[in-house]
Amino acid sequence: AASDVYKRQEYWCIPSREDAEFIACMEDVLDVYELPYNPQRPVVCMDEKPYQLLGEARSPLPMRPGNDQKVDSEYVRNGTCSIFAFVEPLGGAHHVSVREHRTAIDWAEEIKYLADVMYPDVEKIILVMDNLNTHKPASLYKRYTADEARRIMKRLEIHYTPKHESWLDIAEIELNVMTRQCLNRRIDNISNLRKELSAWEVERNTVAAKVNWQFRTEDARIKLNSLYPTFTTASE
């Protein structure tokens, strides 16, 4: 029977049991999101996603009066690339870029761009991101001299989301919005993808699209109460 072959699987967006490490990282990030807007200490969220470049196996039939464009279900895989995204939730600043790979070197170069181009004059950049293996200070030292890597690091205050819990990274929301608005069709090469995302970035920055994050520590302590360690107080 099919039920004997296909076993039901469960996937959790949050831990299924008490998890102090998750709680500690989550509350740290939520505290950052509650900080008031300070242009000298901007809170910036960063995330990245792979993207599959797809070409057409056959030329689409163009739109005609009364008929939509017709696209063949068959497509051609043209390799993959990586999309990096930065968003400042309270300031409304946005940046997306496309790279052929997602190595430590790529991340380091993106962080240098964040520090030297996006925010060259601020006191400190408060950076929220997931703890992917390349999202580490060591990556800067792999790309730049020790002096340069240290200079960039001193510009940053890093906060990591809990492991496997990237829903706490506002930049993931940004990538989801971008996917719905800009990537709902086949794009066959990096050059075209960069043009599409550049236009999308300009639009997002023109309207200074902000993010109103509502989930706070006090909410977490109620809704996720089962994940918090419990303590028994001895009676006197």
Locations of the language-model features?
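Acidic/histidine-rich, metal-coordinating catalytic segments
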Residues: 122-136, 162
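Short, basic/hydrophobic alpha-helical segments
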Residues: 105-126
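Short, small-residue-biased leader/transition segments that mark boundaries at the very start
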Residues: 1-6
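Mobile genetic element proteins and their domesticated derivatives, centered on retroelements
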Residues: 45-47, 86, 111, 130, ...
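Active-site proximal helix-loop segment of RNase H-like, two-metal nucleases, encompassing DDE(D)
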Residues: 94, 163, 171-190, 203-207
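Extended, low-complexity cationic-aromatic segments
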Residues: 26-112, 224
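C-terminal domain-tail junction helix/linker
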Residues: 57, 192-236
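RNase H-like polynucleotidyl transferase catalytic core
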Residues: 69-75, 148-170, 186-189
